[in-house]
Amino acid sequence: MTHSPLAQFDIKKLIDIKMFGFDVSFTNSSIYMLLASILALTYFYLAFYKRKLVPSRLQVSAEIVYNLVADMLNQNIGVKGRKFIPLVFSLFIFILFCNLLGMTPYSFTATSHIIVTFTLAILVFLIVTIVGFVKHGLRFLTLFLPHGTPLWLAPLMIVIELFTYLARPVSLSLRLAANMMAGHVLLKVIAGFTVSLMIYLKFLPIPIMVILIGFEIFVAILQAYIFTILSCMYLNDAINLH
């Protein structure tokens, strides 16, 4: 067992693959992202395979998650946002399952790596930009000039708004990766202290550890929610030019 709190984030090659000079090896990160996808698909398949008038607990939980995402889109975008339910729902579920899977002992948290979260963030960024130009054409560029801006202030505001827009995928990805990494490092460090304290305090430190794990699960769910709701807000900017 390793004692370094950062060792849990090490990328390990499982299958070495090279394509056109690029390293596309199958790693522990790959397998946990694949596992998260399989678990999510299995969960919703079992929940909706035999839908009942009186739903099972599994079906109820799946419907709650679906309605949560649908409400996010409805509140942020309105009726026009319904067509994006598959995208936003898939995004939320993938991040949620990756986060929760990383809470199991000796597992790997794919969303603690900036390359994973940045890929998701840049996907959202590109879709938002494409949707904006497809729907509004060049009028989408008015997003970078707030309504009512004085003419003399327009050049500065355009630069600021453009920089803010381009920084979206960076802030979106860093927020998720940093929170997941910080939480897991904290748990690892405190778990090490807990084992040592049990020698002197018996089982007293265990409730503290349980509370911290519960809090980290809450953070895992919250971070998936925050990433998704910010994506909805960005989509709203592209669709309604707010």
From Swiss-Prot:
Its main subcellular localisation, reduced to a broad class, is membrane
Family (UniProt):
Belongs to the ATPase A chain family.
- Offer a single GO CC term for the protein: proton-transporting ATP synthase complex
Q: Does the keyword Ion transport apply?
A: yes
- At the top level, the lineage of the source is Bacteria
HAMAP family (UniProt xref):
ATP_synth_a_bact
**Sorted UniProt keywords:** ATP synthesis, Cell inner membrane, Cell membrane, CF(0), Hydrogen ion transport, Ion transport, Membrane, Transmembrane, Transmembrane helix, Transport
List the PROSITE patterns hit by this protein, alphabetically.
Answer: ATPASE_A
Query: Which one Pfam family would you cite for this protein?
Result: ATP-synt_A
- Give the InterPro entries listed for this entry: ATP_synth_F0_asu (IPR000568), ATP_synth_F0_asu_AS (IPR023011), ATP_synth_F0_asu_bact/mt (IPR045083), F0_ATP_A_sf (IPR035908)
Functional note:
Key component of the proton channel; it plays a direct role in the translocation of protons across the membrane.
User: Gene3D superfamilies under this entry?
Assistant: ATP synthase, F0 complex, subunit A
What is the name of this protein?
ATP synthase subunit a
Q: How does it assemble?
A: F-type ATPases have 2 components, CF(1) - the catalytic core - and CF(0) - the membrane proton channel. CF(1) has five subunits: alpha(3), beta(3), gamma(1), delta(1), epsilon(1). CF(0) has three main subunits: a(1), b(2) and c(9-12). The alpha and beta chains form an alternating ring which encloses part of the gamma chain. CF(1) is attached to CF(0) by a central stalk formed by the gamma and epsilon chains, while a peripheral stalk is formed by the delta and b chains.
**Gene Ontology molecular functions:** proton-transporting ATP synthase activity, rotational mechanism
- Give its localization: Cell inner membrane
Q: Does the keyword rRNA-binding apply?
A: no
The record gives the membrane topology as:
Multi-pass membrane protein
Any stretches that span the bilayer, and where are they? 29-49, 84-104, 114-134, 140-160, 181-201, 203-223
